[in-house]
C-alpha cells in the first residue's frame, strides 16, 4: 500500500470586519442565490507576488502565485509549508493557544511574500465544519477562538481583513468553483491577454469530504426544485446554477465517532466488537470523548470513566450494516429526488471530481485509476478481511489511520451509491483526485476568487482583460483556513494502537 501522509480532517467560515475597515470596490464577481456575506475588495495596485492558503487536515498550507503581467490573473503554482498542526477548534478549552498555534505557519508564509509587499498583501482567515460544530456546542468558546486568532493575525505584517465562518452551502459551491476554474471549464485567460469562455465545455461536479462534513455540488439536467439548495454564479457574462448541499456530521472523522458510539451503545459488555476493524486489532479507550462530539446525540452511560476494550472482527458485511444505520434512508421513501435524511437532491449526472477524504482513502487502497465499481467493491471488501498483522506489515508508519481505512472505504461506497444515488453506469463518471490543473483541490481558491472578484462577472465592452485595471491583473492575496478536529480526532490521538 502507498504511504499516505496527508489527510483532510474536519474543516473549519459570516465575514467579521476588523474595526475601521470599510467596504471597498464594486459588488463581487459572483454570488449565491442565497447570498454570501458582502465581500471586501481592496483598491489593488500590487505587483505580482506569491500568496498562500493554510488548511486541510489541521493547519496545513499551500502557496499560490497570481502572475500574468498586468492584464489578468492566472493561477500558476503551489507549495505546501512544512508545518502542520491540529485545527483551531481543538483549542476550545484554551483559546489563546489557537492564536499561538498559527505562528509557525504564519512565519513560513511570510517568507513566500516579498517583504516589500507585506503590507499590501491581503490575508483572510476562513473556517468551516469543525468550527461550525463548536459554534453549535459552545458559541462563546468559538467566539473566543476567533478573537484569539484575529489578534495574532492582526499583528502580522500582512493586511489582515478578518475572519469568516463559512456555511456548508458556500463551502460546497466554493469547491465547485475551484475545480472548474483550474480546469479551465468556466473561463480561461488566453496568451493574448483575454478572458475567454471555453467552447462546449461542461462543468464537472464536486464531491468533498472533510472530517466533519461532506458536500455534493453539480449542475443537474433539469431545474432545481428546492431553491435553498441552489447556488447561482455569474462569471464573465455566463450564469451557472448548481445544486449544492452540505451534510454536517457526515465527514469522515465524525462518521467514525458516530459509528463507534452506536457500537458501544449496543454492546451489552465492556468488550465492543467492531466489524470495521481488522481481526486481531484491539484497543482500550475511555468512552467519554465520544460523547463530547455535537454529532453524537446518544445519552452517555453513567459509568463514563469505565474503560472499554474494542476488538476488530473484520466483517465487511456487518460493517456495511452498521454504517447504513448512520443514514436515515426511510425518510426518502415515496419521495422522488431525495438522497437521505429527507434532503432533496436531483439525479446525479455528468463527471465528478471526488477529493479530500474521498481521494485519500481510495489513494491508499489503490483505487484512483477509474476502476469499475465491481473492482472497487471487491478490493475494499478484501482489504477489510485482512488480519491486522498483515495490514500493519504491508503499511508501516500508517498506524494512526490504518484501522479506519476499511470503515472509510465502505462508508464512501455507501454514501455514493445509496446516499447520492450513483449507479454502476454513473460510477464511471467519478474521478478521484488530489489536484486539478496542478493545484490542490479545496474550497479555498473558489472562496478567494469570489472574495477578491478576480473573475469578471461581465464581459467587458473592449473584450480585453486590461479594461478591468490592475486589480484583476495583480491580485495578491493570502488566506488562512483552519481545520477543526473534534471528537474522533481526540480518539485518534489518545487510543493506543494494537
Residue ranges and their predicted role:
Residues 77-78:
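Acidic, polar low-complexity linker/tail segments
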Residues 1-2, 10, 17-19, 35, ...:
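Gly/Thr-rich phosphate-binding beta-strand-loop-beta motif of the actin/hexokinase/Hsp70
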Residues 14-16, 30:
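Ser/Thr/Pro/Gly-rich low-complexity, intrinsically disordered segments
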Residues 63, 81-115, 124, 128-206, ...:
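Helical "lid/coupling" subdomains associated with nucleotide-phosphate turnover
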Residues 28-31, 42:
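Intrinsic disorder
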